[in-house]
Protein backbone atom coordinates (compact mmCIF):
# COMPACT_ATOMS: atom_id res chain seq x y z
CA UNK A 1 0.00 0.00 0.00
CA UNK A 2 1.26 3.47 -0.83
CA UNK A 3 0.40 5.31 2.38
CA UNK A 4 1.14 8.70 0.84
CA UNK A 5 -1.90 8.23 -1.42
CA UNK A 6 -4.08 8.16 1.72
CA UNK A 7 -2.82 11.41 3.25
CA UNK A 8 -4.81 14.49 2.31
CA UNK A 9 -2.66 17.54 1.61
CA UNK A 10 -4.31 20.91 2.25
CA UNK A 11 -2.47 23.93 0.90
CA UNK A 12 -2.37 27.21 2.85
CA UNK A 13 -3.66 25.66 6.08
CA UNK A 14 -3.58 26.67 8.88
CA UNK A 15 -2.03 29.74 7.29
CA UNK A 16 -0.71 30.97 3.95
CA UNK A 17 2.36 29.07 2.75
CA UNK A 18 1.78 25.94 4.85
CA UNK A 19 1.08 22.59 3.19
CA UNK A 20 -0.85 20.67 5.87
CA UNK A 21 -0.63 16.87 5.92
CA UNK A 22 -4.00 15.59 7.13
CA UNK A 23 -3.95 12.13 8.73
CA UNK A 24 -7.71 12.00 9.34
CA UNK A 25 -8.01 10.26 5.97
CA UNK A 26 -5.88 7.42 7.38
CA UNK A 27 -8.07 7.21 10.46
CA UNK A 28 -11.31 7.12 8.45
CA UNK A 29 -10.38 3.98 6.52
CA UNK A 30 -10.08 0.83 8.62
CA UNK A 31 -7.77 -0.95 6.18
CA UNK A 32 -5.44 2.03 5.94
CA UNK A 33 -5.42 2.53 9.71
CA UNK A 34 -4.66 -1.17 10.27
CA UNK A 35 -1.88 -1.01 7.69
CA UNK A 36 -0.39 2.09 9.36
CA UNK A 37 -0.43 0.56 12.84
CA UNK A 38 0.97 -2.72 11.48
CA UNK A 39 3.85 -0.86 9.79
CA UNK A 40 4.61 1.07 12.99
CA UNK A 41 4.58 -2.21 14.93
CA UNK A 42 6.88 -3.87 12.37
CA UNK A 43 9.58 -1.31 13.20
CA UNK A 44 9.34 -2.27 16.87
CA UNK A 45 9.06 -6.07 16.60
CA UNK A 46 12.64 -6.79 17.68
CA UNK A 47 12.67 -4.30 20.54
CA UNK A 48 11.35 -5.21 23.96
CA UNK A 49 9.01 -2.27 24.49
CA UNK A 50 7.39 -1.69 27.89
CA UNK A 51 5.44 1.48 27.02
CA UNK A 52 4.35 3.57 24.07
CA UNK A 53 4.38 7.32 24.72
CA UNK A 54 2.45 9.72 22.51
CA UNK A 55 2.15 13.50 22.63
CA UNK A 56 -1.14 15.35 22.46
CA UNK A 57 -3.17 15.06 20.34
CA UNK A 58 -2.42 13.04 17.23
CA UNK A 59 0.21 10.94 18.99
CA UNK A 60 -2.75 9.49 20.92
CA UNK A 61 -4.43 8.45 17.66
CA UNK A 62 -1.57 6.21 16.54
CA UNK A 63 0.09 5.43 19.87
CA UNK A 64 -2.94 3.88 21.55
CA UNK A 65 -3.75 1.28 18.84
CA UNK A 66 -0.02 0.55 18.54
CA UNK A 67 0.23 -0.09 22.29
CA UNK A 68 -2.81 -2.38 22.04
CA UNK A 69 -1.26 -4.31 19.14
CA UNK A 70 2.02 -4.74 21.06
CA UNK A 71 0.28 -5.59 24.34
CA UNK A 72 1.92 -2.73 26.25
CA UNK A 73 0.69 0.38 28.04
CA UNK A 74 0.16 3.80 26.51
CA UNK A 75 1.33 6.99 28.23
CA UNK A 76 -0.09 10.36 27.14
CA UNK A 77 2.02 13.51 27.16
CA UNK A 78 -0.17 16.59 27.35
CA UNK A 79 0.02 20.34 27.43
CA UNK A 80 0.35 21.97 30.83
CA UNK A 81 -2.65 21.64 33.13
CA UNK A 82 -4.39 18.79 31.29
CA UNK A 83 -3.21 15.79 33.36
CA UNK A 84 -4.97 15.24 36.71
CA UNK A 85 -2.17 13.68 38.80
CA UNK A 86 1.34 14.80 39.77
CA UNK A 87 3.44 15.64 36.72
CA UNK A 88 6.85 16.71 35.56
CA UNK A 89 7.19 19.35 32.85
CA UNK A 90 9.40 20.37 29.97
CA UNK A 91 9.24 23.71 28.17
CA UNK A 92 10.02 23.98 24.48
CA UNK A 93 10.29 26.80 21.98
CA UNK A 94 7.67 27.63 19.40
CA UNK A 95 8.03 29.97 16.47
CA UNK A 96 6.75 32.80 18.68
CA UNK A 97 7.12 31.94 22.36
CA UNK A 98 7.16 28.77 24.43
CA UNK A 99 4.89 25.89 25.33
CA UNK A 100 5.07 23.25 28.02
CA UNK A 101 4.43 19.50 28.02
CA UNK A 102 3.72 17.30 31.02
CA UNK A 103 3.73 13.61 31.88
CA UNK A 104 2.48 11.83 35.00
CA UNK A 105 5.32 11.18 37.46
CA UNK A 106 4.32 7.55 37.90
CA UNK A 107 3.80 6.68 34.22
CA UNK A 108 7.34 5.52 33.39
CA UNK A 109 9.43 3.38 35.71
CA UNK A 110 13.22 3.42 35.83
CA UNK A 111 14.52 1.11 33.11
CA UNK A 112 11.27 1.00 31.10
CA UNK A 113 11.98 0.62 27.40
CA UNK A 114 9.89 3.25 25.63
CA UNK A 115 8.89 3.93 22.04
CA UNK A 116 7.57 7.40 21.27
CA UNK A 117 4.98 7.71 18.49
CA UNK A 118 3.54 10.78 16.79
CA UNK A 119 1.82 11.57 13.53
CA UNK A 120 4.41 13.99 12.16
CA UNK A 121 8.05 15.03 12.57
CA UNK A 122 8.64 18.65 11.55
CA UNK A 123 11.22 20.67 13.50
CA UNK A 124 11.58 18.08 16.27
CA UNK A 125 10.98 20.46 19.18
CA UNK A 126 7.93 18.70 20.58
CA UNK A 127 9.41 15.22 20.36
CA UNK A 128 12.75 16.33 21.83
CA UNK A 129 10.76 17.53 24.86
CA UNK A 130 8.93 14.20 25.09
CA UNK A 131 12.30 12.39 25.02
CA UNK A 132 13.53 14.60 27.90
CA UNK A 133 10.41 13.82 29.97
CA UNK A 134 10.75 10.06 29.45
CA UNK A 135 14.45 10.10 30.31
CA UNK A 136 13.90 12.30 33.36
CA UNK A 137 11.61 9.58 34.72
CA UNK A 138 14.29 6.94 34.08
CA UNK A 139 12.91 5.48 30.87
CA UNK A 140 15.09 4.40 27.97
CA UNK A 141 13.91 5.70 24.59
CA UNK A 142 14.56 2.80 22.23
CA UNK A 143 12.65 4.16 19.22
CA UNK A 144 10.89 7.27 17.94
CA UNK A 145 8.37 6.64 15.15
CA UNK A 146 6.31 8.92 12.96
CA UNK A 147 3.69 8.38 10.31
CA UNK A 148 4.99 11.42 8.38
CA UNK A 149 8.36 13.20 8.28
CA UNK A 150 8.90 16.62 6.72
CA UNK A 151 12.54 16.05 5.81
CA UNK A 152 13.43 19.64 4.85
CA UNK A 153 12.71 20.84 8.40
CA UNK A 154 15.50 18.59 9.74
CA UNK A 155 13.67 17.45 12.87
CA UNK A 156 15.93 14.40 13.05
CA UNK A 157 18.79 16.73 13.97
CA UNK A 158 17.18 17.29 17.39
CA UNK A 159 16.91 13.52 17.86
CA UNK A 160 20.49 12.59 17.00
CA UNK A 161 21.54 9.29 18.55
CA UNK A 162 18.02 7.84 18.67
CA UNK A 163 16.52 5.13 16.47
CA UNK A 164 14.03 7.01 14.27
CA UNK A 165 11.49 5.67 11.78
CA UNK A 166 8.97 7.42 9.55
CA UNK A 167 6.54 5.72 7.20
CA UNK A 168 6.16 8.59 4.71
CA UNK A 169 8.56 11.42 3.86
CA UNK A 170 7.76 14.76 2.25
CA UNK A 171 10.18 17.39 0.98
CA UNK A 172 8.40 20.67 1.53
Curated annotation (Swiss-Prot):
Its main location: cytoplasm. Keywords: Cytoplasm, Glycosyltransferase, Purine salvage, Transferase. Pathway: Purine metabolism; AMP biosynthesis via salvage pathway; AMP from adenine: step 1/1. One of its GO terms (molecular function) is AMP binding. GO terms for cellular component: cytoplasm. GO terms for biological process: adenine salvage; AMP salvage; purine ribonucleoside salvage. Its EC number is 2.4.2.7. It catalyses: AMP + diphosphate = 5-phospho-alpha-D-ribose 1-diphosphate + adenine. Homodimer. Catalyzes a salvage reaction resulting in the formation of AMP, that is energically less costly than de novo synthesis. Belongs to the purine/pyrimidine phosphoribosyltransferase family. HAMAP family: Aden_phosphoribosyltr. This is Adenine phosphoribosyltransferase. It comes from Clostridium botulinum (strain Loch Maree / Type A3). The gene is apt.
